Amino acid sequence: MFLAQEIIRKKRDGQALSEEEIRFFINGIRDNVVSEGQIAALAMTIYFHDMSMPERVALTMAMRDSGTVLNWKSLNLNGPMVDKHSTGGVGDVTSLMLGPMVAACGGYVPMISGRGLGHTGGTLDKLEAIPGFDIFPDDSAFRKIIQDVGVAIIGQTSSLAPADKRFYATRDITATVDSIPLITASILAKKLAEGLDALVMDVKVGSGAFMPTYQLSEDLAKAIVGVANGAGCKTTALLTDMNQVLASSAGNAVEVREAVRFLTGEYRNPRLLEVTMALCVEMLLSGGLAQNDADARAKLQAVLDNGKAAEIFGRMVAAQKGPSDFVERYDSYLPAAMLSKPVFAERSGIITAMDTRALGMAVVSLGGGRRRATDPIDYSVGLTEMARLGASVDGQQPLAVIHANNEDDWQQAADAVRAAITLGQKAAEETPVVYRRITE
């Protein structure tokens, strides 16, 4: 028998906690026998004293085990359970293509996703732009979709890692969100509860990233890879660029539209293609679905070219109660804003830098994101035809097309877009799309 205050005292004094102590405290959070004040105190001591790798693994496993851990054995599936998690960015619509692409190559992708908060978009919000799309199927329906289609994208239910929800809410109001051991446990508790064989992490770097510096992004990637592998899930991470909007669009319906056009081959933004392919390659290799990088890329290109990935996306939408002909008629189903017009720079020049976070907040100001978790979303608004770093802009070549529902919102977003983009006379050096692969 342990006392919560003694566990806090031990960590406060810089000592390592045992697996049993950590599990006791996390179960206490779940069972409401540990107070908010005690959660806050432990979070702050971890923030200042960090955690060893065994402590981090124990914390993650305890949070995972605070609720249901999915088990797929009874379905006798003939492929691995694999997933991807991104630390979030702007125009990061990779999940919508990646899930169907990997499923088309023989993987099973039980993706449990989140909503957008702050400048980052949320996969669930994007999917809810599709009429009827059900992000909370019951457990048997979720399992059936995985068995029949190979991929489902759903929201976190109350039975998955419930201790994390309470722990995170306390961290959010006590300035302890940006602790690497706590971020790692929060991300992985939910992902490992999916019952995965392998996971790939997409850790963003740059002006639109969750972590403010390259070094902190790298530290987080290494922590997640170390803890996930320590917990028995084969995991790699890619550090990818978020110094500009990843897709050509940012919003909800506009990103879904781009995802469908990507899958059907109508239009594939080169940077979005590179990141999506790189993440899919990791998933195929980790899941044993390809022999090497070239083999994985060939398989993935084949399912894009032959339409299998697009077909699986359509089947997933239909299985989750969206329209059965969504891929064929997406424009007739997705909501459109009342006003769509381009924004131009006030002078001509070459785009040398972007404040990607500010561009994400421009989408929020249009109504396409949330400042608070309870805010409603306007699915129709956003940015499209985003200019890229290094592009020349003038009175004919816009910075973006803004989709708004009134003139005032359009003007406010136009001012924000102009302010977020730096112009010069000489192109900046091209940044890599994928900076680094981390395996341990």
Curated annotation (Swiss-Prot):
Alphabetized Pfam families for the sequence: Glycos_trans_3N, Glycos_transf_3, PYNP_C
Cellular component terms per the entry's GO annotation: cytosol
EC number(s) reported in the record: 2.4.2.4
Pathway info: Pyrimidine metabolism; dTMP biosynthesis via salvage pathway; dTMP from thymine: step 1/2
Highest taxon of the lineage: Bacteria
Record's keyword terms, sorted: Glycosyltransferase, Transferase
UniProt KW Glycosyltransferase keyword: yes
Top-level class of the enzyme under EC nomenclature: transferase
One of the GO biological process terms: thymidine metabolic process
Reactions that this protein is recorded to catalyse: thymidine + phosphate = 2-deoxy-alpha-D-ribose 1-phosphate + thymine
InterPro entries: Glycosyl_Trfase_fam3 (IPR000312), Glycosyl_Trfase_fam3_N_dom (IPR017459), Glycosyl_Trfase_fam3_N_dom_sf (IPR036320), Nuc_phospho_transferase (IPR035902), PYNP-like_C_sf (IPR036566), PYNP_C (IPR013102), Pyrmidine_PPas_bac/euk (IPR018090), Pyrmidine_PPase_CS (IPR017872)
Role this protein plays: The enzymes which catalyze the reversible phosphorolysis of pyrimidine nucleosides are involved in the degradation of these compounds and in their utilization as carbon and energy sources, or in the rescue of pyrimidine bases for nucleotide synthesis.
PANTHER family in UniProt: THYMIDINE PHOSPHORYLASE
Oligomeric form and interacting partners: Homodimer.
Family statement drawn from the similarity comment of this UniProt entry: Belongs to the thymidine/pyrimidine-nucleoside phosphorylase family.
Protein name: Thymidine phosphorylase
Organism annotation: Yersinia enterocolitica serotype O:8 / biotype 1B (strain NCTC 13174 / 8081)
Gene: deoA
